[in-house]
């Protein structure tokens, strides 16, 4: 169903190989592994207990937060895996692109790499995928930090997502920017200003703008046509990168994750409203919500502050929540 979403523009601007995206139940996601540079316990084994998997947002990639994960790995003395979702970064292009499929990809990654008691750090799109993974396979995961998202349907964000995708599509299809133009990124930035005035958001999206073929070939993009391109198959992601990202599946009654889950909420963001907090309390009873003075783009606006909050959560905060939950359970039995 999703693979037929091909956007055809006028003949002058068509630069895509006219084939559909393949449909795959799961894909092997590309990843980077961040190990502590100096370990207090000597040489750290590759498969240590309780590694962390960092899960990026829409149009993000494992490269976005390289420095953050290096810092967290050293602060927490544990390996951190950063992944690329399908249709992102270095991972292959394929459909479907929905929460059920992305969650299955994440669970497949954890099981394939034999990760023992991993925890998750999920941001935005990656936050919802992380939450669904906790609910689908609660015994597989130890804990999580969910960054600025909640387990609810969010139709209010669809208009913004449509603008983001339109800006990406029109920049590669209508701006006429050649790959050999040394100012290609600056020109792409200028063109995107027609749709997105915010410099931070443009910078985030432009990390996907390339003038050379990437490591992963795409069945739908001709990277050798002399023009700039996006790493993501944006022309083939109409609707799925909007309605599906704003969606949230129906969770059967009684399903919950009882492990400790931290939620980092931007006070200038609308991604964790009261309906979201109610859903969090129901599905993740052993939670703690942290506020940070930022919009939804917390990781770009408050990098040092959010890294500190995340590190403190995994060092001590989650254990405090576990102790409190155990105390409540004991009192309930009396």
Curated annotation (Swiss-Prot):
Active site positions, chain numbering: 124 (charge relay system), 148 (charge relay system), 296 (charge relay system)
InterPro entries: AB_hydrolase_1, AB_hydrolase_fold
Molecular functions (GO terms): acetyl-CoA hydrolase activity; carboxylic ester hydrolase activity; transferase activity
Function noted in UniProt: Alcohol acetyltransferase that catalyzes the synthesis of ethyl acetate from ethanol and acetyl-CoA. Can also function as a thioesterase by hydrolyzing acetyl-CoA in the absence of ethanol, as well as esterase hydrolyzing ethyl acetate.
Organism this protein belongs to: Hanseniaspora uvarum (Yeast)
Xref: Pfam families: Abhydrolase_1
The name this protein goes by in its record: Ethanol acetyltransferase 1
Transit peptide as recorded in UniProt: 1-16
SUPFAM superfamilies cross-referenced by the UniProt entry: alpha/beta-Hydrolases
Catalysed reactions, as listed in the record: ethanol + acetyl-CoA = ethyl acetate + CoA; acetyl-CoA + H2O = acetate + CoA + H(+); ethyl acetate + H2O = ethanol + acetate + H(+)
Tree of life domain: Eukaryota
Entry's family note: Belongs to the AB hydrolase superfamily.
Cellular component aspect of the GO annotation: mitochondrion
Keyword RNA-binding: no
Location in the cell: Mitochondrion
Keywords, alphabetical: Hydrolase, Mitochondrion, Transferase, Transit peptide
EC number(s) recorded for this UniProt protein: 2.3.1.268, 3.1.2.1, 3.1.1.-
